[in-house]
């Protein structure tokens, strides 16, 4: 079980995402994270533990943006840790996920053969690399 929030706005969203994660924390308190988009860059802050710890890290990093996602996690794949906390991001994609990706092992092996490196023990990271791969190899990426 996990809690997920996403907000897009013309205003800064970080505080609203943290407030929402506090309300969702009963759905997972092993780890928490947030990613925002600011000036075309994905900024990510994650931590093991509760949203309170995440909030302290966010204050130190001064993360901001008008588009953002947040996640509180109850571990299903991989132990509770900062590296396994969501979101998982590449330079182009940031993903939060609740559920189990049944074919993640097969997808991971395929992506590793293409040179993608995995940092976490989660199945969610497969989505990040798969979407990134498709963005950079698809004709749709040019549109």
Residue ranges and their predicted role:
Residues 139-143:
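A short, hydrophobic C-terminal helix/tail in secreted or cell-surface proteins
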Residues 1-138:
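Conserved short alpha-helical segments that host acidic/polar catalytic motifs at enzyme active sites
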């Amino acid at each position: 079980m996990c809690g997920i929030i996403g907000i897009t706005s013309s205003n800064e969203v970080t505080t609203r995402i943290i407030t929402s994660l506090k309300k969702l924390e009963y759905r997972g308190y092993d780890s928490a994270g947030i990613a925002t988009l600011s000036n075309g860059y994905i900024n990510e802050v994650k931590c093991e533990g509760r949203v309170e710890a995440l909030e302290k890290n966010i204050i130190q990093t001064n993360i901001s943006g008008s588009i953002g996602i947040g996640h509180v996690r109850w571990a299903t794949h991989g132990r509770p840790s900062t590296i396994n906390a969501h979101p998982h991001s590449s330079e182009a994609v940031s993903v939060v996920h609740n559920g189990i990706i049944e074919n993640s092992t097969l997808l991971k092996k395929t992506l590793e053969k293409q040179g993608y490196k995995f940092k976490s023990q989660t199945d969610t990271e497969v989505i990040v690399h798969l979407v990134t791969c498709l963005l950079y190899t698809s004709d749709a990426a040019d549109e």
